[in-house]
């Protein structure tokens, strides 16, 4: 993408000046590796990941090397971060609105005003795809009709959590079906064998830094056999640490320098 060309040009200049190699990674690889920085147990095995931000809301399948990232689902229209920012701005909050919107939502959850309101935003999920445009429309109309900002803010996070929970369950179901089918094609079919299915989910991107969203999602999936992995909020929203870690690992792989990841300052 053009927005990343400035950084690439700077890297090439530094490389030429210092005589060091340049390693190229995607923006998405950086976010995934940054989130995995606090979840080293995921490295070396396949897992799912949600990349949630203002520019991306994708469900990904990641291979053990982090080099093969396949998009298997996600939004069909606006992103989760766009939903948060647009409604936050509609409430008079500054862009980006995530942190302020979460504060308003937290207060509504604490004083029970959201629970008492009965207001709920719809969650639209089909297989591994979701939609947030209808949610934005209903929430915007509710604000125009005088619904309390805290109620709408809490409803937004509740909607995103319900949407992600449905996608997690659908992904597990599909993965289990695929694992069973593969087992049948290799050896005697063993109905119900789920040992080969992937059930670990890593959450990356700015939206994933929300404490409320994490708590809501964990609550909705606490009875589901799944591992949810979150990183420190600062690692959710910044992929620079991920790029640094990937470069250090590439250096070690090429036998140049064995760098300790502890040298990466967060």
Roles of regions detected by a PLM:
Residues 264-266:
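Conserved small/polar residues in nucleotide/adenosyl-binding loops
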Residues 43-45, 50-53, 57-147, 249, ...:
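A short helix-loop
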Residues 55, 205-207, 233:
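Active-site metal-binding loops of divalent metal-dependent hydrolases
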Residues 23-25, 201, 218-243:
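Conserved phosphate-binding/catalytic loops in two-lobed NTP-binding clefts
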């Amino acid at each position: 993408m053009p927005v990343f060309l400035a950084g690439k040009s700077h890297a090439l200049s530094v490389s030429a000046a210092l005589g060091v190699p340049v390693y190229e990674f995607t923006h998405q690889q950086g976010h995934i590796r940054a989130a995995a920085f606090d979840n080293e147990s995921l490295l070396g095995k396949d897992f799912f990941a949600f990349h949630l931000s203002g520019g991306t809301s994708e469900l990904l399948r990641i291979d053990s090397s982090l080099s093969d990232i396949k998009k298997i689902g996600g939004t069909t229209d606006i992103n989760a971060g766009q939903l948060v920012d647009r409604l936050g701005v509609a409430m008079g909050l500054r862009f980006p609105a995530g942190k302020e919107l979460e504060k308003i939502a937290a207060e509504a959850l604490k004083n029970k005003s959201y629970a008492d309101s009965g207001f709920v935003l719809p969650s639209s999920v089909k297989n591994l795809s979701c939609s947030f445009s209808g949610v934005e429309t209903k929430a915007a109309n509710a604000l125009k009709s005088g619904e309390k900002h805290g109620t709408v803010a809490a409803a937004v996070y509740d909607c995103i959590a319900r949407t992600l929970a449905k996608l997690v369950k659908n992904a597990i179901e599909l993965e289990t079906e695929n694992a069973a089918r593969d087992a049948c094609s290799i050896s005697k079919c063993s109905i119900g064998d789920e040992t080969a299915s992937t059930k670990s989910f890593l959450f990356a991107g700015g939206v994933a830094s929300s404490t409320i969203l994490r708590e809501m999602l964990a609550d909705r999936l606490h009875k589901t056999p799944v591992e949810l992995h979150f990183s420190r909020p600062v690692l959710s929203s910044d992929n620079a640490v991920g790029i640094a870690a990937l470069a250090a690992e590439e250096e070690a792989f090429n036998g140049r320098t064995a760098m300790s990841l502890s040298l990466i300052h967060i």
